């Protein structure tokens, strides 16, 4: 079997370390030459809630040498189409692309490589890139999991093959209602990632501050309303029914939802959103693929999304240097 992680950044480096430790022949691929050289010299180093340093096969994209049986797609979605056209000729005849990305990437992936070669997957853990060769796992070790889509067009043996690979790192939940699982992750990203990014803080800090928690709750509520309108049944995350816990239709349920938000994110309180990490390094973000996905789907189904709209606007203004992240940005959300 030949495996590649395309986009070995904060998350991909950690997955690659686990797979390499389990003797899986996996290539960690990234454009970051300094990161590649560091991993070649010292291995992939994982710090944070887990400590390890593992020899890995690190490469730049021009050094890829398929055919690949499995490609874990972990790049940002800023140029998914171009990335997929680059990867498609390097897939084995029954090779698959596994979408470990934010947002709703599967339709575009399937349009390029084919539905029978596209497997959706959600990632329920977080990481922070700490420099060449080093990534920090920021989620508690007992809270790590993947949600692997059981896609009807994909042969069962390929799904099992991917499940077996991912299970070398942490538990894998098989998701037959994958859109529901994808939307569960999307509402967490839109809420906690979106709001914490414009504030410049961790998930836990955004949830702890009562003022920001108001807007975090409203962003999540918009996601839930959009899902209902689109007839998407949201799946539990790691056994937690986020829709049941956080949705509300009266003041009492709203108060309960508000109180539960810090508890819901407790094991991931130290996470810094990948969007915030991008902004800190002067890079463009995936906000259009995260909060923007909620806005677009809401528009299709006639559901207003003013809070998600505001997150998208603020993040783009920060990207352009027109504002900076910070708690002062909470003033931009309208009452």
Descriptions of predicted regions:
Residues 5, 29, 73, 99-100, ...:
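Active-site-adjacent beta-strand anchor residues
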Residues 89-90, 112-117, 134-241:
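Internal alpha-helical scaffold of NAD(P)-dependent oxidoreductase catalytic cores
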Residues 51-136:
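Rossmann-like NAD(P)(H) cofactor-binding subdomain of soluble oxidoreductases
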Residues 1-51:
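NAD(P)+-binding Rossmann beta1-loop-alpha1 motif at the extreme N-terminus of oxidoreductases
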